[in-house]
Amino acid sequence: TGIRDLPPALPMILLAWLYILAVFGFVKQAAHRWFPQASAAAYLLTAAGAASGTQIYYLLHRPSVYEYAILCGATFVLWALWQWLCAANTPVNRRKALTFHLVFGSLCMALVAGCRPQMVLFAALALPILWPRYITEKRLCTRRGAGEAAAFILPVVLVAVGLMWYNAARFGSPFDFGANYNLTSNDMTRRGFAVGRIAPAAVNFLAGIPGVQTVFPYLTATRMQTNYMGLTITELYYGGAFACLPLLWGLAALPLARRRLGSRRDLRTVIRLVLVCTVALAVVDCQMAGMLYRYQSDWLGPLLLAAALAWLFAESVLQARPIPALTKALRTALPLAVLAGVCYNFCVYFAAEPQLMGQNPALYENVSRLVQ
């Protein structure tokens, strides 16, 4: 934090709560926009699943400056998406509230560049969120719409000018964020781009299988295996997103209702953009730095929100065309998917390094006795 009496752990706890608040706020606004008939149970379960499946608990387990920057970036991304969705849902006659949401959302997304620059890729989601009002309805061509567009852009410009001035003063270029100057295990300036790194990293990020054992905490770390002849930076890994978080499996059902999804182009575009950004960030991370478990935080939050939208969409489809067997399956699968994500992150928290067995053996042993 740069403040002697404010270690990273304290603001990280606050950021974690803000992250969870943004998840629930986003899902609520998404339900208001696309799923007005969504049940309270579906809203609470999807929001709880997106909040509990995230890596914020793992980051809190390692409260260093590096994890602090990652959590800042992830929190700002979700707040930006939430505020933009609030702006899209705010009636145009409430100009002050509408302008506030636009400005605050853009400010949050602009601040991401100062924390975790690659996460700014999710700013592309502003297009499908705001497109219907400002392009389809041609509000951008009006005087008030132009003013709102200026309010949307102004925070980005101001933060960009400040960051570019800082980068130029410290690193000699307005576009150099200093990532290559990390004192780490390898020369960041000579990593380059190697196609051979992509497939192993992407598979592990998205579908890696964690190690399992029969005693608490039931998960063990694994290491990425690769035939790539160059250097690949890796750390202990605890499983890929799609392999360990069943909430994400809801995305697989979207092609089954592609016609209904096609009638909601903005929703379809939001989900597709999240998937594209997820793959892009997985590739960027493995090329820029390596295959590290905490790098899932760069894209896992928006991906879980997309999965929440998929589950809400499934419920809306079954409300419009009830099929008792599928409705029952949905009502059973969604709580189980959320519970599985909670259990997975619970196990990771006690299995991950630095292990609580050494840091807080009393807590570890008490929980172990309660669970086993």
Go through the PLM ranges and name each one.
Residues 1-14, 32-37, 59-63, 226-237:
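Juxtamembrane segments of multi-pass membrane glycosylation machinery
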Residues 7-36, 79-83:
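Transmembrane-helix motifs of polytopic, lipid-linked glycan transferases
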Residues 23-55, 75, 91-100, 267, ...:
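Transmembrane-helix signature of polytopic, membrane-embedded enzymes
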Residues 71-92, 107-109, 123-126, 302-309:
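Specific aromatic-rich, kink-prone transmembrane helix
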Residues 78, 100-116, 123-124, 155-163:
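Membrane-interface alpha helices of multi-pass inner-membrane proteins
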Residues 86-110, 143-147, 151:
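Short hydrophobic alpha-helices at membrane interfaces in multi-pass membrane enzymes
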Residues 122-157, 259:
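Perimembrane helix-loop-helix junctions
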Residues 226-268, 307:
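Hydrophobic, aromatic-rich transmembrane alpha-helices
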